[in-house]
Amino acid sequence: MGLIRLQKILADAGIASRRASEQMILDGRVSVDGNQIFELGSKFDPEISKVEVDGEVISSKKSKIYLALNKPRGILSTLSDPEDRPHLGDLLQDRHERLFHVGRLDKESEGLLLLTNDGDLAHRATHPSFSLPKNYLLELRGMVSKEVVDAFRNGVELDDGMAKVDKLTVLPGQPGRTLFDVV
């Protein structure tokens, strides 16, 4: 397999995110072949080296998990919440693997979310440098005027810059609501 940074080995095994894995290393919680590791960036071959976290051996042969979840309204797109509000973690209580949500939806939005322990996929799907388009079905109550549609297409100025859709298509709807396909 070759040499891999220790924090990536931990993240790939589903122990924690890379950042949290770095903190575990700095805290002295990680050993490789019986030697406590404190240095970030240390590389090992996970097929050969015995990696332990808090004295427990981790397996490098973790199978990848991909879950499709229909997030309901009223649920936060996070796996834990310090204020104990309803969140994705509540829906996954029986799952013990470390999962990442790929993207997020607002609390009052509903829709498909991908959850995985494949950190590389999650990174490629969400990091802006990969320019992966995101598609949304937007439902608004009432019939929307041409001015509102134009505002969506032209963008709006927010505190942190211009927010603009790449593509907006008005879809056939039902009386009393307007549907958009937004990219």
Regions found by a protein language model. Name each.
Residues M1-V183:
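Basic, flexible Lys/Arg- and Gly-enriched helix-loop patches that mediate nucleic-acid binding at interfaces
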